[in-house]
């Protein structure tokens, strides 16, 4: 159940109760595609850096180790030793972006695994069964992530099919949650809004999925090539359609500036591989923007990555030392920078929640955007 605690303009401060604990929103979900954050970050680390929700990938976990293996191990929470909420995406995005030789039909999608080339079928029922085996807290509906740009006719047909798939997802989840051997009988379902950059299609689809009375809703199909202005325009159009008593998730959008703009438009949930991926390459976020620790100017820099940051890297090591680790190709370099970036994001969300509660989110947003626009 989602409770709206406070609004500051359109920005929402909420609390989402789940079978695996409470999620304070707005929230950034830390992405562990295969049940782990890339960069040697453990579940214990995630708790220490303030992670509330871990996001894993249905497509990848289905391929390895296999969702049946995870079910036999008691579900993903037990498998990865994580007792807080987990959201699994449906696998749709990966099917349409990674998989080879796709064939879309009404029943689902036939594709070849990007790992070993074997032929696989995934449709709404299969996605729900896999996510039920994984036993995540929140399951995402199976949808088609529409390529950008696409013709209006293609988008209309795709959205209509995604709606039919959502109805099948809901029916299958209700069935799975009633079975005696289901691990998480209270698994939640979020529906995904699609429609490309066609505002009227987006709005009509949003109204349709709201009528299905799901546990939450997501805006999908963005951050796939459109401009930031186009993305914000889509959010402006559809966010007001979604109810204030349900969480709203903007999928795959993760620049700090994007997060602030989307929070200002009523979004609650975020995820992105960006902080971990950047960290693995020495690109780290600070209160004054992003820096590249590989740059020569940091060779003798005795300061922490970000002055005042309480992450494990900043509390114990200098920019110069971490740069040395990267140059020496030591794994610790990646680990420290990934931990820092995830801490930065989790702390940003905590500060956003405080700003909404304190009625100063507009000022907070303007200050952050101004600071990030300069050179660190």
UniProtKB/Swiss-Prot annotation:
Renumbered to this chain, the signal peptide range is none
Its BP terms in the Gene Ontology are:
queuosine biosynthetic process; tRNA wobble guanine modification; tRNA-guanine transglycosylation
Which amino acids does the record list as binding Zn(2+)? Answer: 309, 311, 314, 340
Q: List the record's Gene Ontology CC terms alphabetically.
A: cytosol
Its pathway is: tRNA modification; tRNA-queuosine biosynthesis
Reading the lineage from the top rank, the first entry is Bacteria
* EC class name: transferase
Entry's cofactor comment: Binds 1 zinc ion per subunit.
List the cofactors: Zn(2+)
Sorted alphabetically, which InterPro entries does this protein's record hold? Answer: ArchSynthase1/Queuine_TRR (IPR050076), TGT (IPR004803), TGT-like_sf (IPR036511), tRNA_ribo_trans-like (IPR002616)
Q: Name one GO molecular function term.
A: tRNA-guanosine(34) queuine transglycosylase activity
User: Which residues are responsible for catalysis?
Assistant: 89 (proton acceptor), 271 (nucleophile)
- E.C. code: 2.4.2.29
* SUPFAM superfamilies xrefs: tRNA-guanine transglycosylase
Question: Where, by residue number, does substrate bind?
Answer: 89-93, 143, 194, 221
Q: Which keywords label this protein?
A: Glycosyltransferase, Metal-binding, Queuosine biosynthesis, Transferase, tRNA processing, Zinc
| Pfam families, per the entry | TGT
Subunit info? Answer: Homodimer. Within each dimer, one monomer is responsible for RNA recognition and catalysis, while the other monomer binds to the replacement base PreQ1.
Q: Which family does it belong to?
A: Belongs to the queuine tRNA-ribosyltransferase family.
Q: What does this protein do?
A: Catalyzes the base-exchange of a guanine (G) residue with the queuine precursor 7-aminomethyl-7-deazaguanine (PreQ1) at position 34 (anticodon wobble position) in tRNAs with GU(N) anticodons (tRNA-Asp, -Asn, -His and -Tyr). Catalysis occurs through a double-displacement mechanism. The nucleophile active site attacks the C1' of nucleotide 34 to detach the guanine base from the RNA, forming a covalent enzyme-RNA intermediate. The proton acceptor active site deprotonates the incoming PreQ1, allowing a nucleophilic attack on the C1' of the ribose to form the product.
Among PANTHER family, the record links this protein to: QUEUINE TRNA-RIBOSYLTRANSFERASE (PTHR46499:SF1)
This one is known as Queuine tRNA-ribosyltransferase
Species this chain originates from:
Clostridium tetani (strain Massachusetts / E88)
């Amino acid at each position: 159940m989602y409770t709206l605690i406070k609004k500051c303009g359109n920005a929402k401060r909420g609390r989402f109760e789940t079978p695996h604990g409470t999620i304070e929103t707005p929230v950034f979900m830390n992405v562990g595609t295969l049940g782990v954050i890339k960069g040697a970050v453990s579940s214990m680390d995630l708790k220490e850096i303030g992670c509330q929700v871990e996001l894993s990938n249905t497509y990848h976990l289905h391929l390895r180790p296999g969702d049946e293996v995870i079910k036999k191990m008691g579900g993903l929470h037990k498998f990865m030793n994580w007792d807080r909420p987990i959201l699994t995406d449906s696998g749709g995005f990966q099917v349409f972006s990674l998989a080879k030789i796709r064939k879309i039909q009404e029943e689902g999608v036939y594709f070849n695994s990007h790992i070993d080339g074997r032929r696989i079928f995934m449709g709404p029922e299969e996605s729900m069964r896999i996510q039920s085996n994984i036993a995540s807290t929140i399951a995402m509906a199976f949808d088609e992530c529409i390529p950008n740009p696409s013709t209006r006719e293609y988008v209309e047909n795709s959205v209509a099919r995604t709606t039919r798939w959502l109805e099948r997802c809901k029916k299958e989840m209700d069935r799975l949650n009633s079975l005696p051997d289901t691990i998480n009988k209270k698994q939640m379902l979020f529906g995904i809004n699609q429609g490309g950059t066609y505002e009227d299609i987006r709005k009509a689809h949003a109204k349709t999925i709201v009528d299905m009375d799901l546990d939450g809703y997501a805006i999908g199909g963005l951050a796939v090539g459109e401009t930031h202005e186009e993305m914000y325009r889509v959010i402006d159009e559809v966010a007001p359609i979604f109810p204030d008593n349900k969480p709203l998730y903007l999928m795959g959008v993760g620049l700090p500036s994007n997060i602030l703009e989307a929070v200002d438009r009523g979004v609650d949930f975020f995820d992105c591989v960006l902080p971990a991926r950047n960290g693995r390459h020495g690109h780290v976020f600070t209160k004054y923007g992003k820096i590249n620790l590989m740059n020569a100017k940091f060779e003798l820099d005795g300061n922490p990555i970000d002055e005042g940051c309480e992450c494990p890297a900043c509390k114990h090591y200098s920019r110069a030392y971490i740069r040395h680790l990267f140059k020496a190709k030591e794994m610790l370099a990646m680990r420290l920078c990934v931990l820092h970036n995830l801490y930065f994001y989790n702390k940003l969300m905590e500060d956003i929640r405080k700003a909404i509660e304190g009625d100063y989110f507009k000022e907070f947003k303007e200050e952050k955007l101004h600071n990030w626009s300069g050179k660190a």
